A protein has these predicted regions:
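ABC transporter nucleotide-binding domains
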Residues: 2-5, 10-204, 210
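Residue-level marker of alpha-helix boundaries and capping positions
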Residues: 103, 260-261
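ABC transporter nucleotide-binding domain
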Residues: 169-260
Length: 261
């Protein structure tokens, strides 16, 4: 499994930004990480990429414990953060060449040419980053995330600031990368996730509320209803077996269950 998150908890004082969530993402999957602003998506992604320490729980990327080997993890991950930090006084190719050298990429010049073409930066590639539109700055960040050919891509709202045509182009780039890589792609817009993702993980107020394929989530059988219940102490979902009114039980956390009737 390329990404494995186990009972991840991140607390800021009394606030639980991420509340004991667990999920897995396999190679070749493009998984949408959906939720409203402030749901905990960016916090989770920062922990997965080794830029933020969790309060408890474990995260593994390509079998490596992120908390124990944060530098090794960064070699395997291409990360586009929500706030894309760029050097505005550097030229596009100059900056990407610098990133390639940091990652010790073989043939940095040809690699820069490849990613510039891949993300559609060619017309603007000789400009300073500070002269670019917000959409093209976003492309520079995506190119930097791809430059070392990582196994895993973590993209935090990658289409922010793009016009409709640019959004379609970037979606195609992400789809192509998803054939050989693991992609976790966050958004607060359902249509964005529908366009490119195989599966959706939904989080709200730090709690995982759904983890399923789009087709299953969209079926919406009107005869079925579900309720989420939480107990004080951890329980095994076997306690719900034999109850005629419950057709399906999903354990969201050790004390939290989704019951379908």
């Amino acid at each position: 499994m390329s990404i494995e998150v186990k009972n991840l908890l991140k607390e800021y004082g009394a606030q639980k930004a991420v509340n004991a969530i667990s999920f897995k993402v396999g190679k070749g999957e493009i998984v949408g990480f959906l939720g409203p602003n402030g749901a905990g998506k960016s916090t989770t992604m920062k922990i997965i990429t080794g830029y933020l320490q969790q309060t408890s729980g474990e995260v593994f990327v390509c079998g490596i414990n992120v908390a124990e080997e944060p530098l090794d993890i960064k070699k395997k991950i291409g990360y586009l953060p929500e706030l894309n930090a760029l050097y505005y006084d550097m030229y596009v190719r100059e900056y990407l060449g610098f990133v390639a050298e940091v990652h010790k990429v073989n043939s940095p010049r040809s690699t820069v040419d490849r990613v510039v073409d891949l993300v559609g930066l060619t017309p603007e590639s000789k400009k300073k980053i500070g002269q670019l539109s917000k959409g093209y700055k976003q492309r520079v960040g995506l190119a930097a995330a791809l430059i070392h050919d990582p196994e895993v891509l973590i993209l935090d709202e990658p289409t922010t600031g793009l016009d409709p045509n640019q959004i379609v182009e970037i979606r195609e780039v992400i789809k192509k990368q998803g054939k050989n890589k693991t992609v976790l792609f966050s958004s607060h817009i359902l249509q964005e996730v529908e366009a490119i993702c195989d599966r959706v993980i939904i989080i709200n107020k730090g709690v995982l509320v759904a983890n399923d394929t789009l087709s299953n989530l969209q079926k919406g059988d009107k005869d079925n209803h579900f309720v989420i219940v939480q107990f004080k102490d951890p329980l095994d979902k076997i306690i719900f077996e034999g109850l005629d009114s419950i057709t399906k039980t999903e354990q969201l956390q050790s004390t939290r269950f989704k019951l379908q009737t």
